[in-house]
């Protein structure tokens, strides 16, 4: 089935420049329409406890950025939706697939969030399909994102069940060790998986995991993503919820995966790890730099907006793009 399938990842690809048509990169438009709303960038911070909390979500929403609140403060989700709506901001939350989540979804009818993400490690499952159908029945106006998946069959099934977008990526992230613990996943070929899935997708795809540089955002869009979910690049900021730790005078912040023992509590099956990242500056500085770099990407693509990135040529260079630079 996969004999003539090209396998590559972000560091194996270089996009090929086209004639520039803008006077300055500032003319390039990085906005993306996703569901009924338009956002400043096609990126979304990972819905993980060390990346996003209520205050980060509010800052992102006020700034015109997409966000997805994590699902690990279950009791806080309904009040969160109410608070965001009272502030005139969009509400975007996550749910799992356990039985009690069905009642929770039904309880949102009076104040439905604009976006719900069904967030489990292996999203190609009957339990996810059932939950998509339940949300669509109870909250027909809510935009449903479902994942995570790694195959065209999964994308087709979730779309057919009613998902408005699918999240592609099984374990390619920096703090995800699914590939090591289970032998399964898209680690090492995430960009190929994205391309493979996008060929059958009729609805938007969120590329989730494996992003290490701002240039990887442009590459994700080239291979079919409408939105790019990023963990490690958004971790460790002053505003980030992770705990700050000082070692020999240097400050670090904790960052761990959604399926880690720190996330789940002890004695549960674990597919994530905890790492310390050097503490960064403000979140807005990273968002601004991402926007400027993406504007440069658009100018190299020979266009004025994100769509131009979908048409550029590319070469497969097998890890040589670093030219001896440290990873």
UniProtKB/Swiss-Prot annotation:
UniProt: NADP(+) binding residues: 205-228
Gene Ontology MF, one: GMP reductase activity
Active site, UniProt feature: 176
Signal sequence range: none
BP GO terms, sorted: purine nucleotide metabolic process
Enzyme class name: oxidoreductase
Any one GO CC term of the record: GMP reductase complex
One matching Pfam family: IMPDH
Alphabetical UniProt keywords: NADP, Oxidoreductase
Catalysed transformations (reactions): IMP + NH4(+) + NADP(+) = GMP + NADPH + 2 H(+)
Annotated EC: 1.7.1.7
NCBIfam families found in the cross-reference section: GMP_reduct_2 (TIGR01306), PRK05458.1 (NF003966)
Its job: Catalyzes the irreversible NADPH-dependent deamination of GMP to IMP. It functions in the conversion of nucleobase, nucleoside and nucleotide derivatives of G to A nucleotides, and in maintaining the intracellular balance of A and G nucleotides.
HAMAP family linked to this entry: GMP_reduct_type2
Sequence similarity: Belongs to the IMPDH/GMPR family. GuaC type 2 subfamily.
Protein name as it appears in the record: GMP reductase
Organism: Streptococcus gordonii (strain Challis / ATCC 35105 / BCRC 15272 / CH1 / DL1 / V288)
């Amino acid at each position: 089935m996969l004999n003539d399938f090209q396998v590559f990842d972000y560091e194996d690809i270089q996009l090929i420049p086209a004639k520039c048509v803008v006077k300055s990169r500032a003319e390039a438009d990085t906005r993306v329409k996703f569901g009924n709303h338009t956002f400043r960038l096609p990126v979304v911070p990972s819905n993980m406890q060390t990346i996003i909390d209520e205050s980060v979500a509010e800052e992102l929403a006020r700034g015109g950025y997409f966000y997805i609140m994590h699902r690990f403060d279950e009791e806080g989700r309904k009040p969160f939706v109410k608070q965001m709506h009272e502030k005139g901001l969009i509400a975007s939350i996550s749910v799992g697939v356990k039985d009690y989540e069905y009642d929770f979804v039904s309880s949102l009818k009076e104040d439905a969030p604009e976006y719900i993400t069904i967030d489990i490690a292996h999203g190609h499952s009957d339990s996810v399909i059932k939950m998509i159908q339940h949300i669509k029945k109870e909250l027909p106006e809510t935009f449903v994102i479902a994942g995570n998946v790694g195959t065209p069959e999964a994308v087709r099934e979730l779309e057919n069940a009613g998902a408005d977008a699918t999240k592609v990526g099984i374990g390619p992230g920096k703090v995800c060790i699914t590939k090591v613990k289970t032998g399964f996943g898209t680690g090492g070929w995430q960009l190929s998986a994205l391309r493979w899935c996008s060929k059958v997708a009729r609805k938007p795809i969120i590329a989730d995991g494996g992003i290490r540089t701002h240039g990887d955002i442009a590459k994700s869009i080239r291979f079919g993503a409408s939105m790019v979910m990023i963990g490690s690049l958004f971790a460790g900021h002053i505003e980030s919820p992770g705990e700050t730790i000082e070692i020999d005078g240097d400050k670090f912040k904790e960052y761990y995966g959604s399926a880690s023992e720190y996330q789940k509590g002890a004695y549960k099956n674990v597919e994530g790890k905890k790492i310390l990242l050097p503490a960064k500056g403000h979140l807005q500085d990273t968002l601004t730099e991402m926007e400027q770099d993406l504007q440069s990407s658009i100018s190299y693509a020979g266009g004025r907006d994100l769509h131009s990135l979908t048409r550029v040529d590319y070469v497969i260079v097998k890890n040589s793009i670093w030219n001896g630079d440290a990873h």
